[in-house]
Amino acid sequence: MQMSKRELLLKKIKENNGIITTKEALNLGIHKDILKELTIKEELEKITNGLYALPSENIDEYLYFSYRIPKGIFSHETAAYLQGLSTRMPLVYVMTVKVGDNVSRVKSVRDNIIFKYIKKDYYDIGKITITSPFGREISVYDKERTILDMIKDKDRIDSQVFSEVIKSYFAGKEKNLLKLSKYAIKMNMEYALKQYSEVLL
């Protein structure tokens, strides 16, 4: 027996951990009108343009910002928390985007996000995918890239958070100093890194 459009849609949402985009629905042959109808019936909740979720679903900020800024990468203090280098849960999230990326729509509706702009040559250095604390895949910078970002942006970052992150990394067993050094060379940060590594190693 063939599934109805509604059943097909709900099946896809369950596979997607409780969310679906308009694009994904259209790819299944499900028109926007069906999404609208289910929203009116309160079987779905519209999170933002193009993103829907089950009413019971907890839409976390990591998911929201990842959807609104698909090319954004969680970085700095946010990456440090996600990587276990900081115990300070972010109240304001930090994302890195390429110079020229338009994030004005998100900035106009959310005041808990900081965007850092980077040259495209540095954008992919250390980019990885991890599972967020809420169980969904998100883009984030690895520990080594995060250390360099923190050093570069030291004047903006809370001194206690900065100190915790730097000390946690250099005292940790998972540090990769070769990778850190390679990143520093690529990002022209050898001298800045040396100031900290010589003291902490």
Task: Identify the residue ranges that each predicted region occupies.
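Short acidic, hydrophobic short linear motifs in intrinsically disordered regions
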Residues: 15-28
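A short, conserved structural fragment
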Residues: 42-49
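Short amphipathic alpha-helical interaction segments
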Residues: 27-40
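Short amphipathic alpha-helical interface segments
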Residues: 2-18
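Nucleic-acid-binding surface
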Residues: 8, 22-24, 51-201
